[in-house]
Amino acid sequence: MKNVNDSFVSLGHWPFAGSFGFNTDILATNPINLSVVLGVLIFFGKGVLNDLLDNRKQRILSTIRNSEELRGGAIEQLEKAWARLRKVEMEADEFRVNGYSEIEREKMNLIIATNENLERLENYKNETIHFEQQRAINQVRQRVFQQALQGALGTLKSCLNSELHLRTISDNIGTLGDMNMKEITD
C-alpha cells in the first residue's frame, strides 16, 4: 500500500504541463501513451507501409519483367547469332569445297594445256628435224649431182677430141635430118 501512496505522492512532485502534448522521451512515457503512439503509427503507417511495399513490389516485378524481356531478347539474339554462325560455317564449307573443286578443275585444265603444249612442241620438233633432214639430204644430193656433173664434164672433156666431136655433131645432124624428112612425108 505504501507503494500506491507513494505513487500518488509522487504525482504531487511532478510539475503540471501547461498544455496537452506528446512526451517524446520513451523512458518517461507510460503504456497508455505508448499504445496511443503505436495505434496511430499502425493506423496511419499501415497505409504508408502498404504503399511502400506495393511500390517496392511493383519495382521488383517490373525489374523482373524487364530482366525476363532482356533475357528473352538476349536468348533471341544468341539464337540468331548461332544461326548466322551455322550459315557462315556452311558457306565457308561450301566455299572450301568449291574452292578445292575449282583448284582441281584449274589443275586439270593446266595439265591438259601443258600436255597440249608439249604435243605441239614435240610435233614442231619432229617437223623441224624432218625439215633439217630433208635439207641435209637435198644438200647432199646437190653436191653429189654437182660432183657427178663435174666428173661427167671432166670425162667428156678428156674423152672428146675435135674429130670425135665433129663426128658426133654430124651424126646428130643426120638423125635430125632423117626425122625432118619423115615428118614431111607423113
From Swiss-Prot:
Q: Which GO terms describe its molecular function?
A: proton-transporting ATP synthase activity, rotational mechanism
Cellular localization per UniProt = Plastid, Chloroplast thylakoid membrane
Lineage, broadest ranks:
Eukaryota, Viridiplantae, Streptophyta, Embryophyta, Tracheophyta
Quaternary structure, from the entry: F-type ATPases have 2 components, F(1) - the catalytic core - and F(0) - the membrane proton channel. F(1) has five subunits: alpha(3), beta(3), gamma(1), delta(1), epsilon(1). F(0) has four main subunits: a(1), b(1), b'(1) and c(10-14). The alpha and beta chains form an alternating ring which encloses part of the gamma chain. F(1) is attached to F(0) by a central stalk formed by the gamma and epsilon chains, while a peripheral stalk is formed by the delta, b and b' chains.
| Family as reported in the entry's similarity comment | Belongs to the ATPase B chain family.
Parts of the chain that traverse the membrane: 27-49
Q: Which Gene Ontology cellular component annotation is one that this UniProt entry carries?
A: proton-transporting ATP synthase complex
Q: What does this protein do?
A: F(1)F(0) ATP synthase produces ATP from ADP in the presence of a proton or sodium gradient. F-type ATPases consist of two structural domains, F(1) containing the extramembraneous catalytic core and F(0) containing the membrane proton channel, linked together by a central stalk and a peripheral stalk. During catalysis, ATP synthesis in the catalytic domain of F(1) is coupled via a rotary mechanism of the central stalk subunits to proton translocation. Component of the F(0) channel, it forms part of the peripheral stalk, linking F(1) to F(0).
What else the UniProt entry mentions is: In plastids the F-type ATPase is also known as CF(1)CF(0).
Q: Which gene encodes it?
A: atpF
Pfam families named in the record: ATP-synt_B
Sorted alphabetically, which keywords does the UniProt record give?
Answer: ATP synthesis, CF(0), Chloroplast, Hydrogen ion transport, Ion transport, Membrane, Plastid, Thylakoid, Transmembrane, Transmembrane helix, Transport
Q: What is this protein called?
A: ATP synthase subunit b, chloroplastic
**Coiled coil region boundaries:** none
In the bilayer, the protein is annotated as: Single-pass membrane protein
